[in-house]
Structure formats: C-alpha cells, structure tokens
From Swiss-Prot:
TM segment ranges: none
Protein family per UniProt: Belongs to the tfa family.
Organism domain of life: Bacteria
Entry-linked InterPro entries: Phage_T4_Gp38_tail_assem, TFA_Chaperone
Pfam families from the UniProt entry: Caudo_TAP
Protein name as it appears in the record: Prophage tail fiber assembly protein homolog TfaR
Biological source species: Escherichia coli (strain K12)
Amino acid sequence: MAFRMSEQPRTIKIYNLLAGTNEFIGEGDAYIPPHTGLPANSTDIAPPDIPAGFVAVFNSDESSWHLVEDHRGKTVYDVASGNALFISELGPLPENVTWLSPEGEFQKWNGTAWVKDTEAEKLFRIREAEETKNNLMQVASEHIAPLQDAADLEIATEEEISLLEAWKKYRVLLNRVDTSTAQDIEWPALP
C-alpha cells in the first residue's frame, strides 16, 4: 500500500533506508504531522524476509523491495593473478574470483584449486638470476676501469695489477654463468 498524506497527525511504522544504496537498515515508529510525507530515506512498505548473505534494497520507482547479494567486507581472490580483492559494494561477486586464497607464491588456478606454477617460478628465478648477474658485472666493471687505467698508463702497483687480474678473471667467470639454470647457479666468489 502506498503512503497517503492525511489531515490528521499519526504515528506509523516506517522502514529506514541507507542513503545511496536504499538498503534496509532498520524500522521504527515515525510521527507524521498533518499534510506531510514520510521522512527522507524511509518507506512504509515492509521488507521481505532477508536470508543470510543478502540485503533488502528498496526501489522507490517501483515501490518494491529486491534482495541483493551482500559480500561486503569479505575478501576473494582473482583466479588470473591470485590478487586479493576486497568486496566493498553490494551485488554478486565479480566473475573469475574464488574464496580460496593461494598458498604462497607462484600459484595458478586450475579451475577448482590453486596449484604450484613451476613454469612461472622458473621464469622468475631466471629473471632474478639475470638481474643479479648484470649487477655483479657492473660492480666488476667499476672495479676494473680504474685499475685498467693505471695499467694502461704504466703506473699500476703490483697490488693493483694483481687486483686487475683477479677482477678480470671474476668478470670472465661471471660472464660464463648460465642463468637458465637459475636455481643451481654457483656464483664465482668476489675477489
């Protein structure tokens, strides 16, 4: 039944709505003075029974209630990336998510569970080894440059010549490191 204004003051039961979402947040009695309408964000139409995991949302255009899934405050996981998604809005869950969290790094979703993604881990370890190798090559080159300058100018001390030889040997051994065997690499010792 739709609300009708009256010439008489009255107290009626109203159902309060959350501004913005129009979801049911409680009921109470409201005093309605003559020739006035309902308080803002309320209706006099009772909501349906609300099962767990849902909220009742009032559609003021249709003057009716709808049950909408409510997963707010919960965390789900994107099956493509494994990233956690915090649900903050009403409605059904996004597609391609699961309630199951991945256990550790390098996990992929197989349709029913998270499984170890050995290929992704291997590629990560190779990239990590390449980065380490590049950084160590840069360190070696930075040590070699001034020692090589001293040798080229024939002003290097015996200690500098020995260090130059050690750093060059280190750089050659480092260059021979095969990063495709990332987990089995034996890095040469720094001079």
